Every structure is written in C-alpha cells, then in structure tokens.
Amino acid sequence: MGLELYMDLLSAPCRAVYIFARKNGIPFDFQFVDLLKGHHHSKEYIEINPLRKLPSLKDGKFILSESVAILFYLCRKYSAPSHWYPPDLHMRARVDEFMAWQHTAIQVPMSKILWIKLIIPMITGEEVPTERLEKTLDEVKRNLQQFEEKFLQDKMFITGDHISLADLVALVEMMQPMGSNHNVFVSSKLAEWRMRVELAIGSGLFWEAHERLVKLPNWDCSTLDPTIKMRICDFLQKFK
C-alpha cells in the first residue's frame, strides 16, 4: 500500500497536511473520515488512531498521528524544498517555536469562534452567551497581535523571504472562523501576509482545501445521527 492520509478538510490541521502534500506533488490516497458523522469514533478508525483525532498518516505498516509530526515526516521522506523546514539552525528553530506556540494560542481560540458562532447554535438551537463570544474574540485579538509582533514582525513570512510550514499552519488555523463568516484578518499587516501565503500556495489549491469549511453554514444538521448529536451536545457544554 502507498501513503494514506486520513482527513476531513473541515479540520485546519488536515488542511495543512493536504495542502502541503498537494503543493509538493506527494502521491497519497485520501481516506475521508467524516467528522460531522462521527466517523473518527468508528471501530475501523480507532484501529488506525486510538486517539480518535485527525489527521492520521499510514505509510505501509507505519502509522503516525498529529499534524505537525506528519508535516515533518513528509518533509523528510519526500525531500521537500528547504524553505518549508529550513536546514539553518536558527530558522528551523523559529518554525519549531511557532509550532509549539500555535496549539493553544491560535488553534484553540480560532476553533472556538467557529463553535460559538455557528456549530453550537446550529446543533443545539441555543445561542452562546454574548460575553463568552466577546471573551474569545478578545483572546484572538490579543494573540494575533502577539503573532505579528513576535513571529511576523516586518518580514514577508515567519522565517524571512520564503513560506515555511509555520506560515502554512498559521494561515489554515486563522481561516477556521471563516466557516462562520468571521474574518480575523483585520490589520493591514496580517491581511497582506495572508495574501502572500495564499499566493505562495496557489489560490486554486488554497480555496479548494477550504471549500468544505466555507460551505459549512449550508450543512443540514438534521441528518446528524442521534447518538453522534448527543455526544456533540455533551462536548459543546464547555463552550456555554
């Protein structure tokens, strides 16, 4: 068997892996795991990834989870162009630094916006208290300012003049609120960086990867399996 990637492009980490593999001509079989139908909890998928998370990579008998680890693996195995994960000690450390920071500072609050503004009301029929949304938006504003001041500064990209894995991961995570028609790219510096990253990836590939996300408001959640809906409703309580 060749390389298999288990993904749902609603997930920002999955989009990062998908875009990287497609951009670099890495051949793979796309194994779709539907998050909205709870397929990541299926017996078949748990055998692939007991953590029940996406994405997962299967390369022969070797199985790997966690998107950052998968991106590093693909970089090394397929000898991706060096700008993605620079060999220079300090530039590579800068990528590593961002990857360590972004999990809680970018990924979590960006996902919260999508859940609070769209998914919770859509599935439960209840609005999240305004103060909860405002608190999350304040956190996002603060963290984006830190991103600009600490990581982007006055550079074209996080590591300098060329796109890296850090830029790719950052942008797909910041796109997550777009599923609820919320735009976080309000500063000119951030908006200009966003466009540079999109163009470096290729606009066609970029928007192909985000098509499922931007169409999420059109999802008919009445088709959701009752058992999965109950599990999601239990999960959503922590956002209320």
Curated annotation (Swiss-Prot):
<comment type="similarity">
    <text>Belongs to the GST superfamily. Theta family.</text>
</comment>
<dbReference type="Pfam" id="PF13417">
    <property type="entry name" value="GST_N_3"/>
</dbReference>
<feature type="binding site">
    <location>
        <begin position="53"/>
        <end position="54"/>
    </location>
    <ligand>
        <name>glutathione</name>
    </ligand>
</feature>
<dbReference type="Pfam" id="PF00043">
    <property type="entry name" value="GST_C"/>
</dbReference>
<dbReference type="InterPro" id="IPR010987">
    <property type="entry name" value="Glutathione-S-Trfase_C-like"/>
</dbReference>
<feature type="domain" description="GST N-terminal">
    <location>
        <begin position="1"/>
        <end position="82"/>
    </location>
</feature>
<comment type="subunit">
    <text>Homodimer.</text>
</comment>
<feature type="binding site">
    <location>
        <position position="40"/>
    </location>
    <ligand>
        <name>glutathione</name>
    </ligand>
</feature>
<dbReference type="GO" id="GO:0005737">
    <property type="term" value="C:cytoplasm"/>
</dbReference>
<dbReference type="InterPro" id="IPR051369">
    <property type="entry name" value="GST_Theta"/>
</dbReference>
<comment type="function">
    <text>Conjugation of reduced glutathione to a wide number of exogenous and endogenous hydrophobic electrophiles.</text>
</comment>
<dbReference type="InterPro" id="IPR040075">
    <property type="entry name" value="GST_N_Theta"/>
</dbReference>
<keyword id="KW-0963">Cytoplasm</keyword>
<dbReference type="InterPro" id="IPR004046">
    <property type="entry name" value="GST_C"/>
</dbReference>
<feature type="domain" description="GST C-terminal">
    <location>
        <begin position="88"/>
        <end position="217"/>
    </location>
</feature>
<feature type="binding site">
    <location>
        <begin position="66"/>
        <end position="67"/>
    </location>
    <ligand>
        <name>glutathione</name>
    </ligand>
</feature>
<dbReference type="InterPro" id="IPR036282">
    <property type="entry name" value="Glutathione-S-Trfase_C_sf"/>
</dbReference>
<dbReference type="GO" id="GO:0004364">
    <property type="term" value="F:glutathione transferase activity"/>
</dbReference>
<dbReference type="InterPro" id="IPR040079">
    <property type="entry name" value="Glutathione_S-Trfase"/>
</dbReference>
<dbReference type="InterPro" id="IPR040077">
    <property type="entry name" value="GST_C_Theta"/>
</dbReference>
<protein>
    <recommendedName>
        <fullName>Glutathione S-transferase theta-4</fullName>
        <ecNumber>2.5.1.18</ecNumber>
    </recommendedName>
</protein>
<keyword id="KW-0808">Transferase</keyword>
<dbReference type="InterPro" id="IPR004045">
    <property type="entry name" value="Glutathione_S-Trfase_N"/>
</dbReference>
<dbReference type="InterPro" id="IPR036249">
    <property type="entry name" value="Thioredoxin-like_sf"/>
</dbReference>
